[in-house]
């Protein structure tokens, strides 16, 4: 018997909504798990506009404040933010055609202090529609009976890490105060501000130089939280879904930070001065220094964990070398790398050969395509060597076979097509192939944040099954693959990148504690940060084969 779809209602300030909200609503309308059956429009906007006009007429003392704020905003946009690079998630889009056949209720709310309460008659009208989920894309802080007007409550985003940031505005304080990461959650609203029942939590690297791009990144990413959780509720059923929700929210959470609000003009002025200083420092570094990816290695029996012992392999200044992956054969190490040429702004796959004494030869190109290649994940299967280089710019995950070791490789097939994926890492375990890869589901979202897991019985297939817990990690600190999965004393370890602070900041080693068709879990056991050398400011790959331990690193050197 076919399940009834979830009945969804939308809380909007009007039909003109943000681009990211429009995309989310569009996905829901096309889904097989939910129908949008009700739109609730905040009908207070015109009255608010009149109120603002009257206040301005009767309160001239605010005019200087407003003029100063406009001046500060202008200075910020011209001196600091200037060009943004991501699609504007807050661009206004009209949704009326998308929702043309949906029942609409227009309501007015009662404002008490900072919160909005619904009138009883409107609550009754909403309850008559038997809504499963109300999605908040408008209104202010909601309290009162509206919180219980849908079977599963009001689902709402808080674009901030509610452990350390409650209030708003979204993405502002993280960027202006240069926090290493920016959090976001999907929650079921309660009376406690930004402390609802969390359905999903994620972290992204903060964009220090653009509040707009900082917001756009996690707006585009977080729209998928809503659609994923609706699909999960529909598929798993109410009991199983909310059993998991209750378990994940079992601990009390204290909040000991201030309640964040819009900055005063004085605060904004101080923040702008701080950002100008940061920008001058960045421009100075870019003028006189080169932040170049290099390789570092150490030969040692056992496990080499002291990074100050690693020796540098420094490329010429017209290129960088990164993403080392290794095959050991005939007493030699074959180190496959990304060789990136600054002039062409494109990478290809190159090979460095090293003997057991650490003597190595200059790299030679082995795979070059019209598009960028990196992260040459190499592995042996049935006495043959294969490679999965990152080919994100071609929207593919490609498999190559070595036909003449080590220089000649031939394209075999696309394991996935039409996908924005990076650093695919495969692993054979329990009679299955497992693929770990970071994916960007929505254009404008970062590729650093969300790790997806797929499985297949056969390596040579484009029918990879998505894991039910996808994304299995949604955190820029621990998601993106950083090398081959390895085993020590029967324990599986997964290297991952730490992309907080900046891309390529560090890497981690996590123990895989559970891996099957229905479960995945890992525990962070070690985190590497670039603290062992004043000229090393980042590292994001680790691999080991036999005695060779190899990483890449960002080396700050004079131009």
Outline where the language-model segments fall:
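Short glycine/acidic-enriched loop and turn motifs that connect beta-strands
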Residues: 340-344, 392-395, 440-444, 499-502
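Conserved blade-ending motifs and adjacent loop-strand segments that build the rim/top face
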Residues: 468-484, 518-542
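A contiguous binding-surface segment within folded domains or other stable secondary-structure elements
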Residues: 193, 199, 445-480, 485
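Blade-level signature of beta-propeller repeat domains, shared across WD40, Kelch, NHL, RCC1
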Residues: 506-512, 533-559
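One-carbon transfer enzymes
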Residues: 1-373, 377-386, 398-402, 413, ...
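Short loop/turn segments immediately following beta-strands, especially the blade-tip
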Residues: 402-406, 456-462, 511-522
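Trp- and S/T/G-rich repeat-edge/linker motifs of beta-rich repeat architectures
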Residues: 359-363, 407-412, 465-468, 518-525
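Recurrent small/Gly-Pro-centered beta-turn motifs in extracellular repeat architectures
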Residues: 337-339, 389-390, 437-439, 496-498, ...
């Amino acid at each position: 018997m076919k399940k009834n779809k979830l009945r969804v209602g939308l809380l909007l300030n009007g039909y003109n909504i943000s681009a990211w909200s429009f995309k989310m609503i569009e996905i829901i309308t096309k889904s097989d798990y939910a129908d949008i059956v009700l739109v609730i429009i905040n009908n207070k906007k015109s009255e608010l506009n009149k109120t603002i006009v009257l206040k301005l007429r009767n309160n001239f003392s605010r005019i200087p404040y407003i003029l100063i704020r406009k001046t500060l905003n202008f200075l910020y946009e011209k001196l600091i933010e200037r060009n943004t690079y991501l699609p504007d998630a807050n661009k206004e889009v009209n949704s009326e055609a998308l929702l043309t056949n949906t029942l609409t209720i227009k309501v007015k709310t009662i404002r008490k202090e900072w919160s909005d309460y619904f009138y009883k008659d409107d609550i009754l009208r909403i309850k008559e529609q038997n809504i499963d989920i109300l999605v908040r894309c408008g209104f202010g802080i909601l309290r009162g009976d509206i919180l219980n007007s849908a079977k599963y409550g009001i689902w709402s985003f808080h674009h901030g890490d509610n452990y350390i940031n409650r209030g708003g505005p979204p993405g502002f304080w993280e960027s202006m105060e240069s926090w290493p990461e920016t959090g976001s959650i999907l929650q079921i609203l309660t009376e406690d501000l930004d402390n609802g029942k969390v359905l999903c939590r994620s972290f992204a690297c903060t964009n220090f130089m653009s509040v707009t791009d900082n917001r756009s990144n996690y707006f585009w990413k977080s729209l998928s939280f809503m659609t994923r959780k609706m699909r999960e509720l529909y598929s798993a059923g109410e009991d199983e879904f909310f059993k998991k929700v209750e378990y994940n929210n079992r601990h009390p959470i204290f909040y000991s930070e201030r309640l964040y609000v819009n900055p005063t003009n004085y605060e904004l002025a101080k923040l702008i001065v701080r950002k100008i200083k940061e920008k001058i420092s960045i421009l100075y570094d870019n003028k006189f220094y080169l932040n170049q990816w290099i390789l570092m290695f150490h030969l040692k029996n056992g496990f080499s964990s002291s990074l100050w012992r690693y020796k540098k392999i420094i490329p010429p200044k017209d290129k960088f070398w990164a993403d080392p992956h290794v095959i050991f054969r005939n007493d030699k190490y074959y180190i496959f790398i990304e060789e990136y040429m600054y002039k062409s702004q494109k990478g290809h796959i190159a090979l460095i050969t090293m003997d057991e004494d650490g003597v190595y030869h200059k790299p030679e190109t082995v795979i070059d395509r019209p598009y960028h290649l990196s992260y040459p994940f190499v592995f042996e299967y049935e006495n043959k060597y294969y490679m999965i280089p990152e080919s994100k710019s071609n929207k593919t995950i490609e498999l190559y076979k070595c036909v003449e070791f080590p220089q000649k490789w031939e394209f075999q097939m696309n394991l996935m097509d039409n996908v924005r994926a990076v650093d695919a890492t495969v692993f054979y375990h329990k009679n299955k192939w497992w693929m770990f890869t970071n994916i960007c589901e929505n254009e404008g979202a970062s590729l650093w944040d969300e790790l997806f897991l797929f499985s297949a019985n056969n390596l040579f297939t484009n029918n990879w099954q998505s894991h039910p817990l996808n994304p299995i990690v949604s955190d820029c600190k621990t998601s993106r693959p950083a090398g081959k999965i390895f085993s020590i004393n029967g324990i599986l370890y997964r290297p991952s990148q730490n992309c907080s602070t900046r891309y390529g900041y560090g890497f981690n080693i996590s123990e895989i504690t559970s891996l099957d068709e229905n479960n995945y879990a890992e525990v962070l056991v070690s985190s590497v940060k670039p603290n062992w050398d004043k000229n090393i400011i980042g590292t994001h790959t680790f691999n080991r084969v036999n005695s060779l331990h190899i990483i890449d690193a960002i080396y700050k050197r004079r131009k």
